[in-house]
Structure formats: C-alpha cells, structure tokens
Amino acid sequence: MLKSCFKKYTYAQEKACSPIETIERALKKLNQTEKPILKEILRIDDLDRIGIPVYLCKVEEGISKRLGVGDSFGKGITPEQAEASALMELVERYSNFSFLLNANPLVDSYINLKGNTIPMEALLASLHSVFRENSFIEKLKNIKLRWVEAYDLIESKKVIFPLYWFYRIYGTTGWAAGNTLEEATLQALCEIIERHCISTIMEERLEVPTIEIDSIENPLIKDSLKKILSSGIEVFIKDFSLDLGVSTVAIIAYDPLAPTLSLRVYGAAGTHPNPNMALIRAITELVQHRAQVLYREFILNKPGGPTFCFLKFKDLEDAKFLLNGEKIPFNHLSSFSHPDFKVEIEYILDKLLKKGLKAYLVETTHPVLGISSVMVNIPGARLNRPSTKLHPYLLIARQLMDIGYYKEAFFYIEKAFEEAPSYKKLPQILSQAATCAKLAGEYKKSMEYYENLLEIYPQLMGSSKFVNEFISIVESVFADFNFKA
C-alpha cells in the first residue's frame, strides 16, 4: 500500500512538496466541493508577543454543524508553513469526519465474521488492565460493531477493523492529511507516539531527563528558542522518548507575565525519528497552543486549557516532577533520518513491534478533495483522555447506541452502573444514560437520570435545550402511565 516517497522540502520540516504548493492545492480543492468548506483564514499570532506564526482556518457554519468539524489551527517556523499546516488540518478533519459519516461499514459481531479481523484482545488493549479479562473479551465477541477495511502496517496485509470502536476511545489521535499517503502516515504515527509518551509520563508522573539547552546546535532551533526566551518565558526541554527508540521532545514553559493563568505553566511536545524535527514540532506546538488559548479566552470568551494529554499546572511546584531528572546533551537522543518517508515509517514500525504494538491504517482520502488523508490506530497506545478509563460496558453501550440498538445499549449502561456506581456521579455519563433510556422507551429511568443529573449539575436549568428535553421526558412518563392505566 505504501510506496517509496522522497522528501522534496526540508526547511524546518520534511514534506513531499513546498508549503506554497500545499497552500495552492489545498485552497483550490477546498473550493471545489458542492458547498464551501473554508470561511476564512487568519494569522492570529499577533495576539501573542513571541513572533512565531500561527494560522486559523474558520469553517463554514453549515459544514461545522453537519460534520462536527471545528476551526483548525496551523503552526510552523515560516508563515507559509503555518498557513499550510492550518489548511491541511482542515482537510484532515473534513476528510475523516466525512468518512465516518459515509463509510457504509459492515455491521456484525466478531463471532459471525469469517474475514481477516484483528484479535479481539486488541479492542481492550487501550483500557485499564482490569478490563482486559477474558469475560469482557467473550462478551465483546457477540456485540455488533462497525467494521471497515484497514491495512496492517506491520504485516502488510488488509484486515477488517472496528474503526468506530477505536474512534470512541482515541478520538482524532492518529488522524493526518499530507501531500502524499506516506507523508500523512508518518505524521499520524508520530502523533500517536507523541501522545502515548506524554500520557505515560503525566499519568505516572515520571521523572525524565532534562536536555541541556546549550547543547542544541541547530541554528533554526536556537533562533526560535531565542524568540521565546527573549519574551520573558523560561523553558525546560525534556526527553519524553521513554524506551520506544523514537525521539519525543517536550518543552515545559513558565511565563511569569502570562496574560492568562492558562499559560502560566504548560507543556508541548513533538515526535519524529529525527530529534531536530521533534524539537521544532514541540516549539511550534508550544507557540500554537498559546495562540489558541488567547484566541479562545480573549476573542471567543471561552475557557482555555492545557495542551492535549498534558496535566493542568497552576504553578511550577505543580510541575516539579517534570523539572527534575538527569541532564543530558541533545545529541544523546536516538536519531534516524532518511530521505524516503517509507523508510522512516518502517523504522518506526520496527520500534513499535519490539514493544508488542501494531499499527493499522485506514485511508480516508475524500473523493472530491483528493488530498491524502488517513486514520492510524495503534491498539495499546496510551492516551490521557477520559475515554481510555471507561468501563468496557459503557463503550459497548456507545457502540450500540450509534447503530440504533437502544435497548441493548441501555442494558450495558445499567450493568456498568451496577459494577461501578461512581459513574452515576459523572454528568456526561448520566446524560448519555438518560438519552439512551429515553430512546429505549424507558421513560421513568430516563427521568430518574435527568433528575440525578440536575442534582449534580444544577446549572443545566439555564439551558433551554435541557429544560425542553426534561419536559419531554416528563410528558412521556405521564403518557405512558395513562396508556397503561
């Protein structure tokens, strides 16, 4: 499936063509769809004081509502790189959400499938170890899931893959668009590894090596760091690679002059076989996150938060475990570079296989856009996200709800509440339970869960949507009672 593909642009990033070519192609394709996708593209780093470019693509409202595609952001050392990055993120999101909506997957249980499926154990590999028991695996074998054709990157063969199961766990992690399929695949693999390493370190609060800034020799990196440091921001550069053999570099930033508390102490990271590329990604990610937070808080009046998978830090004391660790020179990081994307992909796959991990690729290139887009999944990769901590019964319920099996879904929600009553204290889970109960015709149960939800989160009474939904349930309960009477 993957072919030899050589890099043709290597200034601060490695691509199959120049950013200018990417911009021209993306803009042309985004304007060829039946309804416009891109509303406008803006440079937003003027909200900050660093001077490294960040771009924002605003999505047409109709597309946003229909597909759930939000605004996309882009980063880079040059304005052209940042603009191309924002456009390609929009291509990625539009292509992949369109694929999820229109893929026409095979709906069946594992036990009925005679094709080349992935092992059922892989479906639980991303969850807590207590949920990987045979009892859960056996139940899962009989659940109807949605399957699509994927490509096993390790064994180089087609398989039947439960994409929607993993989407509910990993979200958009492992999504990428690129100038070629190989460029997109490498980017997707690096993102998964990056978030796996961040999540492992955050969840276990691991102490990892600190990279000596003076040991960094790349002039582009030194110039970018100078812009950050001269803005009064202190940085700590960390080796987040763990033992995977692929460089993951993180930056912890401390800004005593931060315009918002969300940016007082925060982190960002980057992964690439070439540590210079990994660190450049971490730098541009750090700057992009600042611009995103400032845009959300000061333009949209919405709360900002930590970078994806990172913990929220109030101050440096909160992040103390990240400031410790032995000091090492930058050239101690594992390093591999090759002019062919395919060779670098094979290098990463070999490192993953040594850790017992496999990667699966679903090509999602949109038929109108024609720009390579992928969803890559690595079952067992860690992600510091609530969905990876859910009881399997709740994940099963979500899958069944998605295909309209509401009574079966409600059964598993109730089973999850029996085994773990603490879920009844989580607003999002209660809301899902109330909705599922209503759709299953269990109106009394639905009303009970809505009442519990109000006790936990009374602010919902300020939502007209919630109030109307609650009134609808009450009316259904009384109608059901009168019918039976």
Tell me what each language-model feature is.
Residues 1-485:
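Helix-biased "structured C-terminal domain" signature
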